[in-house]
Amino acid sequence: MMRTYAGHSSAKESNELYRRNLAKGQTGLSVAFDLPTQTGYDPDSELARGEVGKVGVPVSHIGDMRALFTDIPLGEMNTSMTINATAMWLLALYQAVAEEQGADPAVLQGTTQNDIIKEYLSRGTYVFPPGPSLRLITDMISYTVNNIPKWNPINICSYHLQEAGATPVQEIAYAMTTAIAVLDSVRDSGQVPEAEFGKVVARISFFVNAGVRFVEEMCKMRAFVQLWDEITAERYGVTDAKQRRFRYGVQVNSLGLTEAQPENNIQRIVLEMLAVTLSKDARARAVQLPAWNEALGLPRPWDQQWSLRIQQVLAFESDLLEYDDIFSGSAVIEGKVAELVTAAREEIERVQAMGGAVAAVESGYMKQQLVASHAARRARIEAGDDIVVGVNRFDTTEENPLLTDLDSAIQTVDAEVESAAVAAIRQWRAQRDQEAVSAALEELQQVAGTDQNLMAATLACARVGVTTGEWAGALREVFGEYRAPTGVSGVVGVAEAGQALTAVRHSVRTTGEELGGRLRMLVGKPGLDAGFEVIYQGIRLTPAQIVAAAVAEDVHVVGLSILSGSHMELVPDVVRGLAEAGLDDVPVVVGGIIPDADADTLRSAGVAAVFTPKDYDATAIMQQVVATIRTAHGLDPQAA
């Protein structure tokens, strides 16, 4: 299966993109949804401002889903949907549109990501607390096994764990403990007869990562295969070897893609793809590759085509697929696999002893482990122990002709997309049968308060025109919302005090003494290592809430991290809000995937400093933040 992860702006524009990609030889679809859709908000919600259509396509109701798949027969398509907290809702919309096209749900093929554990640990698009979230997953798996048997209702994602810093051992162990939590919940719900439980196991799929250390990554995949076979046989009694098969798709690593010398990302992507294709016994069933310029911004269709062609050259020009497993019998490979399996088993047992994956999320254990691993990785890069070509070694370069016109080297989203989506959803609400909508939402809430399966009530909501925000809002009233542990503490991931960090800590301490107290920073993990008192209230805050927190906590600097492309809308709002609150002397610093032209505009709007992926040295960043604070207070930035 060859796919590219795609979707942006609107359902209509994304549909055109999908049909172009299919015409180029893509064999399936991988749908990216925007953040409001992922987190259960409509485009006119205050929390959706600046985010509509940015990192994916907005789907607010069945009308949007119809537009998304116009002239694409869903009965013949294999569609992967990267959706988690609202996965049940998007599957209901997909099924409803497929039925309108005349397709039998029993023939539908595809995947919903639906792994909420990794949302608490990495991506952050959770909505409900772990218990109700696991109930939604359980209901959805039980429904699909009985009604959409070719569907993969959950794609357990070790991919995002690696992006959040996981080592290969942590990636294996936390994915397996997530799978155990899900399978135990389905088994204990009684919705699937014991004799048919093998069908549930057979539909569990995984979405993994593959880094540039491709030999170790290939061994990791073989370790995954071995452990999954053991767990499904021993814990769940599945005797059919086919049902125990480790089924996985992959997107290779994005964390390691660099803004500096981004042309080097192509060879990184190729090496990472080899990790999941070289070994036949552990080969991915579906592969999607990131684009070379993802560290710069949203890739263009041409960039996605390049990634697709890489797969096609490997599949159709090389001889890799003509051979059995070329590593079978290798003592080196078998030794590394055994090492990974042993260490992963130990970590699985540690998490299970805590009460399982959900308990390890609620206690903050898993998050702390990932934060510590990621901090260690960053420290190795800063120290030069881990070489990143073009970043901390071999950083002299010729001019890159691919970047001569940087504004055309990335895809941008029209500023009118959001206003059009807001107008469209208001029109949608005005034209539907409101009585039917109210009745469907009332039934949804009633069922949510019982142990009945929620899928039927969700389908009813989809068919009468309920919106994404209304469906999620109704369940928020029953289940509540969740704010996951940050994993940030004074003892997690604190760096060793090398010469540069010692100098930063001295600057922080001296500046604090000059200003009459310890420096206080709103948001921002790196401040801990430098000696800042960090105020971090989690994700998903409006500009007004950020300003209110800055006022309440009397901070010296506000740090904003925005990776979705909404920096041009949201950051100026924070700067204006601080000024209106009388905090003109509180500088704002911003980090994210921000093109140079946007960075210049933000600085003109009053932002003190802009950091992008090329700024890999966290210690140097913190030194610049201290200098920014000193400048804002009329102190010599070089004196501390």
Predicted regions mapped to residue ranges:
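Short beta-strand/loop segments at the ligand-binding rim of alpha/beta enzyme cores
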Residues: 1-2, 245-248, 517-520, 580-590
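Conserved, mostly hydrophobic/aromatic
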Residues: 25, 61, 102, 228, ...
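Flexible, glycine-rich loop/tail regions that form catalytic "lids" or insertion modules at the edges
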Residues: 300-301, 305-312, 316-503, 551, ...
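Short beta-alpha connecting loops at secondary-structure transitions
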Residues: 49-54, 79, 118-128, 161-165, ...
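Flexible glycine/proline-rich, aromatic-decorated loop/lid segments
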Residues: 196-200, 238-252, 260-293, 299-320, ...
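Cofactor-cradling patches in redox/metallo enzymes
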Residues: 528-623
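Catalytic alpha/beta active-site cores
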Residues: 1-217, 235-238, 242-249, 277, ...
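Conserved phosphate-handling catalytic cores of large alpha/beta enzymes
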Residues: 311, 610-639
